[in-house]
Regions:
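GHKL (Bergerat-fold) ATPase N-terminal catalytic module, capturing the glycine-rich phosphate-binding loop
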Residues: 1-73, 78-79
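Generic, well-ordered alpha-helical scaffold segments in large soluble proteins
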Residues: 27-31, 91, 95, 137
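Generic recognition of stable, solvent-exposed alpha-helical segments in well-folded globular domains
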Residues: 19-23, 27, 83, 87-90, ...
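Conserved phosphate/pyrophosphate-binding and hydrolysis machinery centered on Walker-type P-loop NTPases
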Residues: 11-18, 78-85, 120-128
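Broad gene-expression machinery/nucleic-acid interaction feature
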Residues: 29-31, 42, 66-68, 89, ...
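ATP-binding catalytic core of ATPases
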Residues: 62-112
Length: 166
């Protein structure tokens, strides 16, 4: 089961943006490669149409953490597998604003999808200020009323409620 495994309440703020989840992506992909850096090692596993092609492999030692998922949608299931880099990039940016401090990277490895230097299209988002950074982003193309963003935060761990306003 792949649902709701965000720490620090992240699942509650990303609920409308996370899509169908890795279980569905895995089942509908001709190939999925997962790399997880945790517990001091790099762990990898590959899948074909939702079925592991080998057991989880324990790789090299690392002090890093993070997860990389690559997938190839099955052309036998989908009429089109052409994705818009701009749409996905916007979605990743929105998720990064909502999950303060989370790093989200997107790289387009399709032939012909390159920048002016001939490199694959790639973006990396991390917003340490969360929704305050989102308001700053919105203000970057508009006139602002105040020099600094007015922001309030409150949390009641017992009631399992948190509030962020900017």
């Amino acid at each position: 089961h792949a649902g709701g495994k965000f720490g620090d309440g992240g699942y509650s703020v990303s609920g409308g943006l996370h899509g169908v989840g890795i279980s569905v992506v895995n089942a509908l992909s001709s190939r999925v490669e997962v790399e997880v850096k945790r517990d001091g090692f790099i762990w990898t596993q590959q899948y074909k149409l939702g079925v592991p092609t080998a057991p989880v492999a324990k790789g090299a030692a690392t002090t890093e953490t993070g997860t990389t998922i690559q997938f190839w949608p099955s052309p036998d299931i989908f009429e089109t597998t052409d994705f818009s880099f701009e749409v996905l990039s916007t979605r990743f940016r929105e998720m990064a604003f909502l999950n303060r401090g989370l790093i989200l990277s997107l790289t387009d490895l399709r032939p012909g999808h390159v920048d002016e230097k001939g490199e694959p299209l790639s973006v990396r988002y991390q917003f340490l200020g969360g929704i305050t950074d989102f308001v700053k982003h919105l203000n970057s193309t508009r006139g602002e009323l105040h020099k600094s963003v007015i922001a309030l935060e409150a949390e009641d761990k017992k009631a399992r409620i948190s509030l962020e306003v900017s």
